[in-house]
């Protein structure tokens, strides 16, 4: 059987929520260092999808764009509620 005929298993958990956490920490620090209100800027980005809310400083914009917004929101809600990923 060729590899093209085999079903590949995708596990969302392979995206490692720790990476989302680390990304948010880095973005938060970059926003703080630039003098912005980090919470307002991150919320603005998550609601609008506009990367202009996140500075390029310390590669913060590129880092946050590596994650889907719904993935970031999922991690935030899970963390807020103290729930582990199933």
From Swiss-Prot:
Annotated signal sequence is: none
The record's InterPro entries line, in alphabetical order, gives:
IreB (IPR009309)
- Similarity field: Belongs to the UPF0297 family.
Return the Pfam families for the record: IreB (PF06135)
Q: HAMAP family in the record, alphabetically?
A: UPF0297
Protein name per the record? UPF0297 protein LSEI_0786
Classification from the root reads: Bacteria, Bacillati, Bacillota, Bacilli, Lactobacillales
Q: Which PANTHER family match?
A: UPF0297 PROTEIN YRZL (PTHR40067:SF1)
């Amino acid at each position: 059987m060729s590899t093209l005929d085999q079903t590949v298993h995708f596990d969302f958990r392979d995206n490692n929520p720790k990476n989302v956490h680390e990304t948010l920490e880095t973005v938060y620090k970059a926003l703080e260092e630039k003098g912005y209100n980090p919470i307002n800027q991150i919320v603005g980005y998550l609601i609008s999808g506009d990367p202009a809310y996140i500075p390029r400083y310390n590669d913060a914009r590129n880092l946050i764009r590596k994650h889907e917004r719904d993935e970031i929101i999922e991690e935030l809600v899970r963390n807020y509620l103290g729930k582990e990923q199933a």
